[in-house]
Amino acid sequence: MAGCCCLSAEEKESQRISAEIERQLRRDKKDARRELKLLLLGTGESGKSTFIKQMRIIHGSGYSDEDRKGFTKLVYQNIFTAMQAMIRAMDTLKIQYVCEQNKENAQLIREVEVDKVSTLSRDQVEAIKQLWQDPGIQECYDRRREYQLSDSAKYYLTDIDRIAMPAFVPTQQDVLRVRVPTTGIIEYPFDLENIIFRMVDVGGQRSERRKWIHCFESVTSIIFLVALSEYDQVLAECDNENRMEESKALFKTIITYPWFLNSSVILFLNKKDLLEEKIMYSHLISYFPEYTGPKQDVKAARDFILKLYQDQNPDKEKVIYSHFTCATDTENIRFVFAAVKDTILQLNLREFNLV
């Protein structure tokens, strides 16, 4: 104790700084314990970015008029991307236009440089409307599993009159439906009951997955999204590989990573609305011969796909929490995420000094 009296002013200042650093480190450690890191994983187009948008709507500031205006150009571009995909598929699938005029309309739309689109001209709108009404294009749309077409194509094309209005401002649903492939890593933090939920969305395409490694530290939970409707579709990157087989293989890889041994796993079986439509005409057994349930049975199909993923889990002690979702339905996601939040908090009670 006597030695302390002999400390120089410089040494006292050094001790004070050391003590302050120690206090700050303790505070940081406590703060870190009050932050949950949720890693959103899944193959491309499984609905991860839409889920993040829903978190912003439900638990964040939502989308103001100004925010939504910022999506106008993307809505237009999504429409051209969809129509161009169908025009190309008309050639590939050798489907004829019923209306002769639509050959010219198709040429007009084909020449559009999508990434430069910022407006819709009257000629373009008329061409798109006539094409969409053509029975040939409708047949092509019905065969969309044979090529790559965004899930939002029908939503936008059937609403082209509203979207073409001069004063058009995208609605919340328009924003949720916009498709922009995620490149890189997007973080979205939001505060719930004094705990920060930090949601991390990473690109689902194969080329993006090598970037995931940086996200693997201290992950509380993995939310893995599966597109239920992709059982009969092929990959954008490889046209002879089934999308669901790829998703299933990725899920197995993720849940057996050593980094995630202590992370809870939540499975979102997404796009349940699209499965309900598709199962009526595209039979599961044609793509998964091991399916023994009845045709056109939504519940049997959902249960079969859930079991496909549960069977990838080698650790039978590890619980996989599952939910059937529709990421474009705000009320469905509000309900599901409330259950997910409770599950995550229950699993982390001690960590967060909640007991």
Swiss-Prot record:
Chain positions covered by the region annotation G2 motif: 174-182
Annotated stretches, region: G3 motif: 197-206
Positions with a binding annotation for GTP: 42-49, 176-182, 201-205, 270-273, 327
Region described as G4 motif: spans on this chain: 266-273
Source organism, top-level taxon: Eukaryota
Residue ranges of the region described as G5 motif: 325-330
GO CC, one annotated term: cytoplasm
Keywords: GTP-binding, Magnesium, Metal-binding, Nucleotide-binding, Transducer
SUPFAM superfamilies: P-loop containing nucleoside triphosphate hydrolases, Transducin (alpha subunit), insertion domain
All copies of domain G-alpha, residue ranges: 34-355
GO BP terms: action potential; adenylate cyclase-modulating G protein-coupled receptor signaling pathway; phospholipase C-activating dopamine receptor signaling pathway
GO molecular function, a single term: G protein-coupled receptor binding
Region annotation (G1 motif) ranges: 37-50
Residues annotated as binding Mg(2+): 49, 182
Listed SMART domains: G_alpha (SM00275)
Listed InterPro entries: Gprotein_alpha_Q, Gprotein_alpha_su, GproteinA_insert, P-loop_NTPase
Family the UniProt entry places it in: Belongs to the G-alpha family. G(q) subfamily.
Subunit description: G proteins are composed of 3 units; alpha, beta and gamma. The alpha chain contains the guanine nucleotide binding site.
Chain's role: Guanine nucleotide-binding proteins (G proteins) are involved as modulators or transducers in various transmembrane signaling systems.
Protein name: Guanine nucleotide-binding protein subunit alpha-14
Organism, as annotated: Bos taurus
Gene of this entry: GNA14
